[in-house]
């Protein structure tokens, strides 16, 4: 943190970052670590780096990017290594060109640690406010205006709003404004872009319902354990940030180790009481069945994706369950992964079952698996 917030035109920052998700955190840290006086603005300081969808880092076409961020001095790799509850190297039986490290993280531990890193970073201020608009002078962005009419000025403004920019949430025919469930969307900022003549397009992403761990019959599922010899994301750490989180895994997950615990730690870290000495947590695999297909296909007309209600373009390699049954009609079943959201929660994420179907249909679909 710096010595104090800089308000008004007479006290500009070098850089202002709007948003505190994965991109915003890396942008703010990169700026501050290069010596620039930086301000990060977010609507809620308690949801910095919140893993809104799957609490995992890396995987196919993503694991290499995490390592590239690390090589450039970023924090994501270290944050994942120190808060992971399971490590897996995907495509381990194939060549290194297609291998991909992946870590299932503790959703809250990841969020809390990243916030702590930001709070300790020199040259970086954090402020809770919704950015309502950009301030232009002479055709150039020179600052931002918040929902409280507070103005901050800077030489550079970085916008990392993610799903919050005029976000809409669809559950069947039900539509609500929001960046994610429980959080407001950023409405005013879109108007600033339009005023500047910047064209806006709408993108789409989806997420599955979370389920209660105690409701799962694990005897019907295939267990997926973490790797015995974990492949980590971070190459090294020379940042020397004090009092950052620490993870230990028990010896049963370390190959040929003479040590009692496997340590993922960095200089001057303190230990967290809920992590030391605990094993990696298993994920579980299952499939959709004929009943699942029936429920989805019988209700396609209720899906916002197929009724024309959703106009945005979705991610190519993360199709919804509706898309899977339509685009891959020849497949009788689709693979699903049940993944824990953390050590201290009973919530589980169903990887492969993202949907925008109505609540009742989602319930029938879940009960069919």
Q: Residues of each region from the PLM?
A:
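Intrinsic disorder/low-complexity segments
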Residues: 1-8, 240-269
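Terminal amphipathic helices with adjacent charged low-complexity linkers/tails
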Residues: 208-221, 320-333, 345
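Conserved N-terminal/central alpha/beta ligand/cofactor-binding core
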Residues: 12, 29-137, 148, 160-180, ...
């Amino acid at each position: 943190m710096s010595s104090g917030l800089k308000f008004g035109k007479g006290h500009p920052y070098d850089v202002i970052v709007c948003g505190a998700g994965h991109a915003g955190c890396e942008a703010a840290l990169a700026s501050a670590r290069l010596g620039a006086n930086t301000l990060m603005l977010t609507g809620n300081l308690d949801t910095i780096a919140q893993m809104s969808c799957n609490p995992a880092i890396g995987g196919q076409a993503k694991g290499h990017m995490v390592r590239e961020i690390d090589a450039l001095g970023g924090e994501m790799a270290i944050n994942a290594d120190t808060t992971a509850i399971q490590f897996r190297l995907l495509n381990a039986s194939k060549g290194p060109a297609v291998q991909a490290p992946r870590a299932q993280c503790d959703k809250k531990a990841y969020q809390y640690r990243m916030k702590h890193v930001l709070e300790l970073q020199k040259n970086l201020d954090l402020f809770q406010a919704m950015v309502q608009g950009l301030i232009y002078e002479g055709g150039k962005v020179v600052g931002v205006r918040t929902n409280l009419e507070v103005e901050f000025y800077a030489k550079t403004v970085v916008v990392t709003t993610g799903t919050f920019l005029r976000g809409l949430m669809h559950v069947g025919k039900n539509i609500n404004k929001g960046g994610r469930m429980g959080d407001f969307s950023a409405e005013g900022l879109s108007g600033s872009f339009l005023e500047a003549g910047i064209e806006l397009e709408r993108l789409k992403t989806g997420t599955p319902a979370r389920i209660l761990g105690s409701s799962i019959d694990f005897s019907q599922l295939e267990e997926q354990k973490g790797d015995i010899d974990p492949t980590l994301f971070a190459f090294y750490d020379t940042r020397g940030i004090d009092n950052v989180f620490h993870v230990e895994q028990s010896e049963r997950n370390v190959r040929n180790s003479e040590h009692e615990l496997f340590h993922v730690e960095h200089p001057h870290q303190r230990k967290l009481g809920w992590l030391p000495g605990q094993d990696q947590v298993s994920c579980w695999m299952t499939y959709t069945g004929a009943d699942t297909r029936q429920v989805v296909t019988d209700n396609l007309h209720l899906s916002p994706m197929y009724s024309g209600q959703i106009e945005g373009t979705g991610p190519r390699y993360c199709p919804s369950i509706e898309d899977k049954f339509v685009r891959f009609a020849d497949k009788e079943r689709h693979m699903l992964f049940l993944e824990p959201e953390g050590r201290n929660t009973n919530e589980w994420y169903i990887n492969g079952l993202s949907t925008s179907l109505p609540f009742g249909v989602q319930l029938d679909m879940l009960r069919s698996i």
